[in-house]
């Protein structure tokens, strides 16, 4: 698929409707994605209203594409539907645990990626928001998510109003391990990251953030130990609140 080879995140959208017909078609096609036990352990909350998008925005650090996109999808790990079905059919469900969350989260993220591929093949632009798992309680409250439903991904969707350049990727050899895992030597790390570190765009990131290396942009500025630990606590609390962790 050329759309995969050429994909970029789209954060600016044209003032053009994404019809219910098109959206539902893409969502239905995405349901053919792999799923554990054919249970489809996911659900999707569609937000179109300005009010709804403004309510979600703070959970995503008020990134402008949340309110600027015609459609925002919140994809949830959902064991509630399966649990209620089982209870109503004389089953004894036991899905209030971390393994069940992982199974449902995997289903939800597979669905998210399949939908993204389909949407972009249809000409739409998307942006995956990793912020969904940073402050999940805000999303849970805003979307009124019940027990055994946990937000794991968000997509903003619309017709592109920008065409950004492709971002760099590590070389294929950096991710492939034949037969067994081969740990990373310093020489391999240097090799894998040489091209990324040599790019002028990334050199500029280092300069404007007033650090010595590109790695420090990520560890000291963007994804700090302090923030990761604090948000981990919040995520675990949300899992407990939603019934996946005791």
How would you label these PLM feature ranges?
Residues 1-246:
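Acidic, surface-exposed loops and disordered segments
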């Amino acid at each position: 698929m050329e759309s995969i080879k050429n994909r970029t995140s789209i954060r600016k959208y044209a003032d053009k409707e994404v019809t219910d017909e098109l959206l539902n078609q893409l969502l239905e096609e995405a349901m053919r994605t792999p799923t554990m036990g054919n249970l489809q352990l996911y659900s999707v909350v569609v937000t179109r209203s300005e009010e709804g998008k403004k309510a979600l925005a703070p959970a995503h650090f008020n990134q402008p594409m949340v309110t600027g996109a015609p459609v925002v999808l919140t994809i949830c790990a959902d064991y509630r539907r399966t649990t209620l079905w089982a209870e109503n059919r004389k089953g004894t469900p036991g899905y209030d645990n971390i393994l069940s969350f992982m199974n449902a989260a995997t289903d939800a993220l597979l669905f998210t990626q399949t939908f993204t591929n389909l949407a972009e093949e249809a000409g739409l632009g998307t942006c995956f928001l990793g912020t969904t798992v940073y402050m999940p309680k805000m999303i849970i409250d805003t979307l009124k998510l019940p027990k055994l439903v946990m937000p794991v991904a968000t997509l903003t969707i619309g017709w592109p109003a920008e065409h950004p350049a492709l971002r760099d990727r590590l070389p294929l050899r950096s991710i492939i391990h034949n037969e067994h895992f081969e740990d990373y030597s310093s020489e391999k790390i240097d090799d894998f990251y040489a091209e990324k570190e040599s790019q002028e765009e990334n050199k500029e990131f280092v300069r404007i953030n007033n650090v010595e290396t590109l790695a420090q942009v990520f560890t000291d500025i963007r994804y700090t130990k302090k923030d990761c630990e604090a948000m981990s606590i919040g995520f675990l609390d949300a899992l407990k609140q939603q019934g996946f962790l005791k």
